């Protein structure tokens, strides 16, 4: 399970240094892809396989299912960390997430989300009503 918030930066070669705690759980090789809300999702190889198997069951006749699978898989790539724990974020994902230099990685249960520091700050300053969300989660039995 991934938890916590980590602030760091890309180096001059667009590599991020994965924080040690996240690296321990992600492993030396993991998958990143376009996430929702303008961030990048990172999954362990095992978790990616589980997600892939679930998405394979979506009906090809459903337009929304096809669109989501295209979106999700078109941005996916495997990241292999070097001995210093650095991994390359491809240009297309940097552009998608608005990442220039400063990034925030957050643990969110089975995935890590990688945000530009600016987008993460804006997200946290938005008018999200967490009390209302908590009520809705309660209605779902959570």
Swiss-Prot record:
Claim: Transcription is one of the keywords in the record: yes
Short name of any one Pfam family annotated for the protein: MraZ
Domain of life: Bacteria
Assembly mode: Forms oligomers.
Subcellular location(s) per record: Cytoplasm, Nucleoid
Alphabetically ordered keywords of this record: Cytoplasm, DNA-binding, Repeat, Transcription, Transcription regulation
InterPro entries, per the entry: MraZ, MraZ_C, MraZ_dom, MraZ_N, MraZ_sf, SpoVT-AbrB_dom, SpoVT-AbrB_sf
GO molecular-function terms, A-Z: DNA-binding transcription factor activity; transcription cis-regulatory region binding
Listed name of the protein: Transcriptional regulator MraZ
PROSITE patterns the record matches: SPOVT_ABRB
GO biological process: negative regulation of DNA-templated transcription initiation
GO cellular component annotations of the record: cytoplasm; nucleoid
Ranges of residues in domain SpoVT-AbrB: 5-47, 76-119
Coiled coil ranges: none
Keyword Transcription applies: yes
Family under the similarity heading: Belongs to the MraZ family.
Chief place of localization: cytoplasm
């Amino acid at each position: 399970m991934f938890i916590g918030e980590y602030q760091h930066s890309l180096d001059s070669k667009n590599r991020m240094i994965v924080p040690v705690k996240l690296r321990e759980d992600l492993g030396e090789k993991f998958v990143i892809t376009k996430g929702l809300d303008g961030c990048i999702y990172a999954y362990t190889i095992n978790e990616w396989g589980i997600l892939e198997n679930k998405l394979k069951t979506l009906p090809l006749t459903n337009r929304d299912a096809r669109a989501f699978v295209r979106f999700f898989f078109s941005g996916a790539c495997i990241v292999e960390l070097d001995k210093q724990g650095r991994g390359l974020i491809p240009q297309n994902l940097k552009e998608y997430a608005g990442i220039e230099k400063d990034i925030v990685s957050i643990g969110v249960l089975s995935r890590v989300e990688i945000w530009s520091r600016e987008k993460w700050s804006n997200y946290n300053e938005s008018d999200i009503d967490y009390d209302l969300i908590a009520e809705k989660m309660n209605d779902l039995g959570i």
